[in-house]
Each structure stands twice: as C-alpha cells, then as structure tokens.
Design a protein with these regions (language model features):
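Nucleotidyltransferase catalytic core that binds NTPs
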Residues: 1-143
Length: 143
C-alpha cells in the first residue's frame, strides 16, 4: 500500500466566493489529503498591502467546513517553505496566475530543491476577492 499524497493549498480566502470553492474542489485531484493554509491577517497585510475584510479566525472556520478540505491551518510565516517544514506536503497548489511569474518561478525552484511538486489551477475570472473588496469600498463611500 502506498503512502498518501499530501497537498497544500495556501490562500487568503477573504470574502469566500466561487473561485475559492473551485480551487479547493479541484485541488483534490492532486492529492489524497488536502491541507489548506489560511494566510493570517498580518501575513496578508504584509504580502498584499491591506488587511483582509474577514479576520483569519473566521476565514479558517469557513475553510474547515468545506467538504474537500481534510485539514486547515493558519499560515503565519512569510515563506511557503516554512509551512513545508511544518507539514511535509508532497505538492503545493497555486492559481495559474502565478505560473511564469517571478514569484511562481521562485516557488518552483524552492520546492524542486526539496522534492515537492507545484501544481497550478485555472484562475476563476468571474469573481475575485479584489473585485468584491472594491465593490464594498464603493458602496461604503456612497453610503
């Protein structure tokens, strides 16, 4: 009997929407056991320049209750390799908006060095957290 293949899908998962659900559903094709890393508020602010609308404790609870997710953890470190050191996953799953970018190339290089595959999933163009955030900001300004 072979060992299970562990996947890791990190993300902010703010203002949870269909794109997030698609990522989690489709991530299961790459692994037997899916761990989702919910990026902490502090790391999200550091990486994206603004704090999520929904606090990470609530985002974590939402993700934990998605049937495709076997385990959810808070990602509270600046480098994905630090999460690998904790969790020892076999494949990291990212949106294909990373593919061919400097950050995607670095991710592939870093993980190749420790024998971890990088899998990409298509980005859902219909709905994004950025779009939802902009709509909310416009509504609040006009309120």
């Amino acid at each position: 009997m072979s060992e299970r293949r562990v996947g890791y899908a990190p993300g902010v998962f703010d203002l949870f929407h269909i794109g997030h659900l698609n990522v989690l559903r489709n991530s299961k094709q790459f692994c037997d056991y899916l761990i989702v890393g919910v990026v902490s508020d502090e790391m999200a602010q550091r990486n994206k320049g603004n704090r999520p609308v929904v606090p990470h404790e609530e985002r974590l609870e939402i993700v934990e209750h998605i049937k495709f997710v076997d385990e959810a953890v808070v990602e509270d470190v600046p480098h994905k390799l630090e999460m690998w050191e904790r969790l020892k996953f076999d494949v990291i799953i990212k949106g294909d908006d990373w593919k061919g970018t400097d950050k995607g190339d670095k991710l592939e290089s870093d993980f190749a060095a420790v024998g971890v595959d990088v899998a990409y999933l298509p980005y859902t163009k219909r709905t994004s957290s950025t779009m939802l955030r902009r709509l909310l900001e416009r509504e609040i300004e006009g309120f």
